[in-house]
């Protein structure tokens, strides 16, 4: 089964933390070796062998005295960079693991995806630590070996340091450009598919609401006039017809047209009868003879 985005990030941060711990250990070891070499050099000078050291094939005394503090400072910088990278990796991994234990399996994925800048900083510190360590190691090679051997080792280590710095700069610039593009232009991880489902449901729910409103709407609305027996009869028979199953057999629009046509015919008959009764000749006394 393929790992999730958070699992892959946690595995990468674990490996980065292990490498940063190894780098910090190498920096501390180099720092102690330089300190021991400096104490040994001072002991040789105290014994009266300074002239022999100055005349030997190694570096001159003034150059060695200048390069030793520089190499020690670089080794201390390597130690600081390694510990900083280790702490960042451990912090990011710990927070991601704690969020994964909480409710919602995608919380840690979102956290690790949002803190990608922190991961880039940790990786940059690690690469800078390696470059500084190679520079300090080249100086230590000049101090430890003879001039020819030390120069060859220092040149190789220095060229490797320059190549590593160039690759590091190019990689960090590309990572910064990718971070500026935003979430929509980056390659989306697998957990973004889960967010599309609530959006589709929210788009489909307004479509279902008008359909429910159509079913709830009555197919007709008539208001019978007072004293109109036909209107009251139509109003009384319409619900009975709907209960008898007309709604299932006829559409709402067709039923509405049929009822409107029938009611219109009876309205014409009642209107004609009222007009004839309204224009009766004679007075009230003559009306009694008609009865």
From Swiss-Prot:
Region named Disordered: 189-219
Membrane topology per record: Multi-pass membrane protein
GO cellular component terms, semicolon-separated: membrane
Keyword terms of this UniProt record: Membrane, Transmembrane, Transmembrane helix
Subcellular location: Membrane
Secretion signal, residue range per the UniProt entry: none
Residue ranges of the TM segments: 12-32, 70-90, 125-145, 153-173
Pfam families membership: Jiraiya
UniProt cross-references to InterPro entries, sorted A to Z: Jiraiya, TM221
Protein name: Transmembrane protein 221
